[in-house]
Amino acid sequence: MPNVDEETLVEQGAIPPTDFHDKIERIREISDYEIEAPEDLTARLDQAISGLLLPPETLKAAAAALRVGHIVLQGPPGTGKSSLARALCEAFNASIFPVTAHEDWTVFDVIGRLELRLHSDRKEEIVPVNGYFTEAVIRCANATVRHFDEPMEPQAEWLLIDELNRAHMDRAFGELFTVLGTDSAIPITLPHQRDGNRNLVVPRRFRIVATLNSFDRQFVNNLSQAIRRRFTFISVNIPDKRPAGSMWTNADAAAPLAIREFHIVVNRVASRVANRLTSLDPTKTDEKSVELRTKLSGALSDSVQKLFDLVEQLRYAASGGRVPHLPIGTAQIIDTVELFLFRVLQDGVADANVAEVMDWAVSVKLVPLFDSDVVAPEVLKEFAEHLSAPFNGATRRELLGIVAAGMHFVE
């Protein structure tokens, strides 16, 4: 029997190609393969979210939803939606094709378009350019074939869309409504591609993992019922309120998420600042991180705890009360404490004066978040006027400035 090379087998249709960009219609050949759930999926999920503040139920719900179809992770800013999305992809052994939604998206950005290209020899050529969805599907098919030969390779590539509701989804996704809502191998027509390379079948192994900021939804585009029906929505919220009488400094591993958040913030800030300070000599990073962690847990701990007390008031404020509701995410707290620590170190602030630095950090990091908070001006004004130390200085002034400037949003 004569030797037949792999390229010949691909051309004869005996085996699928390893790159479908010029053979889009052959994706149908591998489209029926379902997602493989790793035997150690639970362990992989736990490993992937080790640094995230998530209740087990949220993780289990997201994993189950991904097994079935496309998902949207919704919640306030800074709660770890994007990190969870990446962690889920990692746990399922899928690489990601990340994009951020934009209000100007059209079907040309999502499906594809023709572009005029100027080559180095000054010749012009019209070339097809795949949109985000099309490119992600092709890459997913490529990954699936590679995974057949190399099981350690990703089994798929998934489209990760941040801030999904910033785009006009009905306008941008067009005929994708049909294929996202069925398990049937219905092809999408790609008008920007050449004849014979236009019919795209979405593999069963492909997923869209999207994030959605549920807090400022009044400032972005609402998702239609048609879009919502094609995704499972998983809420990623701030931690539940700490039990009454619990101390922020409780180091028990079984402590509630709100308490564990305090220690995660301290550790994350110490690590980030240490990396910045020792970038020219990484051998000193670990030592510096321990030093900063000790400082945050010691001399600076009172200021950090007062920040958490303030955040707790805002996060769990009751509707109609004298405290405005603002679901501040962990990421914003980390940013605030990092800025606080840097200022203390930079200015050589004495321990007796660090509270003023925390007040300043809150005024420039957290107060601007109220510019998009839906709160009656009288509530914001009363809250500012009744702030206690250390937030009765710069933080109060900035909040009252927002009230005076009319930059709040009234219900």
Name each model feature, range by range:
Residues M1-E411:
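C-terminal regulatory/interaction module of P-loop NTP-utilizing enzymes
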